[in-house]
Amino acid sequence: MTEQQKQATRDRIGLRIATLRKLAGLSQEQLSERAGLQRTHVSRIEAGKYAVTLETIQAIAEGLGMTVDIIDPALADLAPLKRLT
């Protein structure tokens, strides 16, 4: 994967998280508290400055009251795993 492709992925996921957060009526501070993350971390993820791990996506999804596949449909196969734990 090229750096350009990696950045495009970070941008896409960041934009999706920001959109879902706003639709949920949450501030970055509220989401960060719910997800157990620093507000600056959420801000940088939304800006596409950080590559996110699956654990972070799971924490954000839980903070939003959603499953990981809502954030990134490519993770649809992993959503049932969270339900089992």
Where are these regions (language model features)?
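A short, Lys/Arg-rich alpha-helix, primarily the initiator
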Residues: 1-23
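Recognition helix of helix-turn-helix/homeodomain-like DNA-binding domains
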Residues: 36-51
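Acidic-residue sensor for enzyme active/binding pockets
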Residues: 28-29, 46, 55
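Conserved hydrophobic/aromatic packing and binding residues within compact polymer-binding modules
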Residues: 17, 31-32, 42-45, 71
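Short, charged recognition helix plus adjacent turn
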Residues: 70-85
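DNA major-groove recognition helix of helix-turn-helix/homeodomain DNA-binding modules
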Residues: 53-70
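Short basic helix-loop element that most often maps to the first helix and adjoining turn
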Residues: 15-34, 59, 85
